[in-house]
């Protein structure tokens, strides 16, 4: 079974009067996610989906695209895995700004899974900013809390005063988050239930300025968030409780249907290396895998059922060489965390280099942590 959805409890301080009737009016909801494309400005479900919004004015679809940066990659469910990197959205910034200025309303929806909880941690997850201290809105992980900064005519330059703490999160647990605002009301729904609501947030967006939409970090910031994002939708309208519940219910079905995959940890001796490709061989690709042959010495977790295996490693990420792979030497022992290659369908469309003579061996994918690109060393030798 997939990961369970955590229970939510609304804190006493988050209680507020029931939404006014006009706020509870729900758009006609289709039997899917999202339930309505009314006032939908940005949509990114996962890499396999078209991520398109039909433009009624132009009578054509508009596609929401972006680029992985740093060590970011896609996971087996085609979600953004932003550990060590970011997802840079393309062609949406001015449209998002103008849309929100027209309505002075905003709704941010996403499925968020954090990998790390630490009291010292402060990492932006979703930002519409251009530098630290000047964002229009920011969803932040601060310790084990989700925090929201919203810039209005009644707040400071980046919406951090007042800072709004929305919800406490747990590592490894997917949460469907909706944060919705109109002047005089800020509300947060987690997994279809209201967990925070306040009437103290006021002001329009007249002080908003041109910014950049980024996932996994903040423009000009040094801290990268570690976790996965998917099911992202941004609207220039307030979302009703009914719509938040509807969207959660439909996305939850997809996540609950997912099955965990086997993870292996082995000590293995590098037997044969594929020659390191040059960046010129990537052509238009930003990422590439290289395949090596290993002789398994010890199985520390799980049993790969073979004494000799093929392992695919990232050799380029964001067109930068992964030095931990280039540093590997034939005859050396390495500790590897692995998954079966076939359990990672997101790799099918990635460029792959393989010179290994024994091409029919069991095939695995290296998921070892702490991979670094050029200028940083991370090969783990035993």
Where does each model-flagged region fall?
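Extracellular glycan-interaction surfaces
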Residues: 63-86, 109-118, 138-202
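A carbohydrate-recognition surface predominantly in extracellular/luminal proteins
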Residues: 38-41, 97-116, 135-139, 173-175, ...
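Extracellular, beta-strand-rich glycan-interacting domains
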Residues: 1-4, 41-50, 107-116, 222-251
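Beta-strand acidic-aromatic groove motif in beta-rich domains, primarily in extracellular
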Residues: 118-126, 347-351
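Extracytoplasmic low-complexity segments
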Residues: 1-87, 93-99, 129-131, 245-257
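Flexible glycan-contacting loops in extracellular carbohydrate-active proteins
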Residues: 198-229
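Structural detector for short beta-strands of small beta-barrel domains
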Residues: 262-284, 290
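Disulfide-stabilized netrin-like
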Residues: 288-380
């Amino acid at each position: 079974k997939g990961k369970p959805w955590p229970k939510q409890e609304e804190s006493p301080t988050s209680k507020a009067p029931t939404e006014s009737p006009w706020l509870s009016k729900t758009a006609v909801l289709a039997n899917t996610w999202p339930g309505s494309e009314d006032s939908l400005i940005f949509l990114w479900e996962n890499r396999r989906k078209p991520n398109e919004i039909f433009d009624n004015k132009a009578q054509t679809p508009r596609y929401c695209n972006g680029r992985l940066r740093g060590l970011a990659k896609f996971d087996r469910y085609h979600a953004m895995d932003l550990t060590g990197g970011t997802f840079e959205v393309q062609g949406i910034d001015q449209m998002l700004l103008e849309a929100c200025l027209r309505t002075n309303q905003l709704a941010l929806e996403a499925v968020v899974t954090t990998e790390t909880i630490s009291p010292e941690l402060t990492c932006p997850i979703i930002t519409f900013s251009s530098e630290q201290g000047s964002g229009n809105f920011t969803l932040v992980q601060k310790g084990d809390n989700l925090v929201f900064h919203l810039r209005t005519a009644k707040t400071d330059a980046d919406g951090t005063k007042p800072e709004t703490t929305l919800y406490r999160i747990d590592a490894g647990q997917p949460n469907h988050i909706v944060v919705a605002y109109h002047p005089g009301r800020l509300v947060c729904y987690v997994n279809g239930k209201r967990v925070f609501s306040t009437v103290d947030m006021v002001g329009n967006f007249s002080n908003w300025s041109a910014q950049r939409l980024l996932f996994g970090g903040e423009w000009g910031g040094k801290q990268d968030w570690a976790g996965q994002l998917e099911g992202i939708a941004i609207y220039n309208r307030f979302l009703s409780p009914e719509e938040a519940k509807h969207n959660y219910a439909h996305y939850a079905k997809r996540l609950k249907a997912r099955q965990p995959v086997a993870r292996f940890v082995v000590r293995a001796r590098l037997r044969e290396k594929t020659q390191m490709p040059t960046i010129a061989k990537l052509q238009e690709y930003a990422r590439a895998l290289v395949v090596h042959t290993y002789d398994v010495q010890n199985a520390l977790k799980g049993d790969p059922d073979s004494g000799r295996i093929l392992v695919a490693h990232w050799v380029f990420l964001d067109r930068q060489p992964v030095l931990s792979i280039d540093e590997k030497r034939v005859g050396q022992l390495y500790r590897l965390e692995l998954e079966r290659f076939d359990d990672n369908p997101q790799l099918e469309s990635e460029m792959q280099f393989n010179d290994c003579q024994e091409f029919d061996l069991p095939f695995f994918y290296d998921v070892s942590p702490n991979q670094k690109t050029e200028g940083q060393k991370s090969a783990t030798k035993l």
